[in-house]
Amino acid sequence: MAESFKTGLRRPRNIARVSDLHARAADFLARQARLLEQRLYATLFEGASAAGVVEALRGYQNEDGGFGHGLEPDKRCPASQPLDVQVALETLVAAGTSDAAMLQRACDHLAAVGPDGGVPCVLPSIAAYPRADHWGDGDFPPGLNPTAAIAGLLHALGVDHPWVDTATDFCWRELDREVPHDAHGLAVTFGFLEHVPDRQRAEALAGPAAAQLPEAEWYLADADAEGYGLTPLAFAPTPDSRWRQLFDDAQIEAHLDRLERDQQADGGWPVTWEPPSEASRLEWRGIVTLGALRTLTAYGRLR
């Protein structure tokens, strides 16, 4: 990355304005966010121990070792869901912490759900509970999404469990068959390729995967685009992200400008899809607001 680019990112145009942006976002999190996002904010921005994040996550872990209870808020189902395991792992990585017993139990659960390595995003158990329309009846096949994300995160956390190897083999088989053509599939693939131990194989697939992104479904290359999708900042949330090189400086700057503009009057950021309830919407807004703060701070737009 060019030094001039790094310098430019770390000189906010209006420090008073962006500091106010942060203060209003922090107020929104204090008023509206879940305990989990509040504890993660305290860890990332206030120097609090990551132990608080782990303790908040425990409330979502079930006796079977999986995570549920709407940890991913688009379904209000208490039963364990693979996608909720992914969110738990993402939270631990974000907090820079781990919990061996929690992770071993989660892997035991994943092995029971996907003994051949692959798991679906959600299970049919969600059908008995309120959920976003895109989850339908919860009948999904095992796939790269979310298996690749989960496997990559477990590698990032250094988890040693037989299922991690089984899931890794599943992901390689799927990627050898076909590289995803949608933004969600590419996002989880990138996460897997970033952390999987076989670096030679990962680097060989990085180029073909990256080549799919410009035309991928649900990818929003244009910072002025409206509606739901993943922007370049979803793939490169920090300047030193592995996939930052896929985007030019002007594109990143434009999306950072848009991210700043999208803050709402109440201090939070909006969601661009329809959650199953107002409670779910607020939970999601806490998640995306914290994500916006993390990205804007990483790129030098906030302090």
Q: Whereabouts are the PLM-identified features?
A:
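Preference for long, amphipathic alpha-helical scaffolds in soluble/luminal domains
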Residues: 2-303
